[in-house]
Amino acid sequence: MRVGRILQADLDALPQSVSETVDYIDSLQRRVAFSYLVDVLSRRDHSTKEIQDKLKGQGFSPSSIESAVEKARQSRYLDDARFASYFVDERVRRGWGRIKIEQELQRRGVDPAEIPGYPEEFFDEHSDVERAAALLARKSIPENKPFEKLVRHLMSKGFSYSIARDAVQQRLCRDS
């Protein structure tokens, strides 16, 4: 669509032969794909898979997508390690647990094992229990089956059962 608009605006620039026209359109599509990619990345960082999906959704050809992604990587506009590191830091600040963060990274096409220093630099058992306890501090204790409901709540936030259990036990003992 974007390429078509540019072509329509500048019909005089089209070469006369078919092969030259095809090459011209292919070149134009690659430039437009890269321009769109930079525009998307100017708003926030994305993973390579997210960018590829966005470009595909805009109707760019696979070769244009590949070219734009490669150019963005070489220019360091697109960096999965940087994206993943920022993503994990941000989600930890929001109170997400390790399991939920890993699932979300995989959904976004990033393998957590490829993140430098993951998980040691981002998580430790003590801080996980503290973050889980902080989430519970904002939640009222249900009257019916409080242990099960609070553990389920923490597990839905991505905390392991053992961390959720410890945090809930601390909260219930403190408030009893």
Walk through the language-model features, giving the residues of each.
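An alpha-helical, amphipathic repeat domain used for nucleic-acid recognition
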Residues: 1-176
